[in-house]
């Protein structure tokens, strides 16, 4: 038997030996979002007959950027409210207070998000009445006491 001295072949013609650790496409692209899973969803969803190799990488990068942007703003909103945990209310405040994200997610309803605080200026008390109450009377009138005759 001649095969006793040679290394066995395996894995479709490659030489035997220790197998290399597989590197995911997410790692190659430097992303946290799963490129392979997004590619599978693109194919399974039948959005097109064929899906290019760069499409899931690009889509994963875009989704990761949007998620990071929303989470950063929501974290700021949580910190402003002196909280350490992001809740749906913070997500709503973050998205609605940002002009571009507000346009992108205009038709989205956030469960348990509440509403933006907004009071119509007509309903607010008049500023002139506040100023008149705070200002002291003129010193010439306020400083003099009535003279006794």
Curated annotation (Swiss-Prot):
Where is the sequence biased in composition, kind Basic residues?
1-23
Query: Which GO molecular function terms does the record list?
Result: DNA binding; protein heterodimerization activity; structural constituent of chromatin
This chain's source organism reads: Petroselinum crispum (Parsley)
Which protein, by its recorded name, is this?
A: Histone H2A
Q: List the ranges annotated as motif SPKK motif 1.
A: 138-141
Q: Where is this motif: SPKK motif 2?
A: 145-148
- Family the UniProt entry places it in: Belongs to the histone H2A family.
Function of this protein?
Core component of nucleosome. Nucleosomes wrap and compact DNA into chromatin, limiting DNA accessibility to the cellular machineries which require DNA as a template. Histones thereby play a central role in transcription regulation, DNA repair, DNA replication and chromosomal stability. DNA accessibility is regulated via a complex set of post-translational modifications of histones, also called histone code, and nucleosome remodeling.
**Database matches in SUPFAM superfamilies:** Histone-fold (SSF47113)
Query: Is Nucleus included in the keywords of this UniProt record?
Result: yes
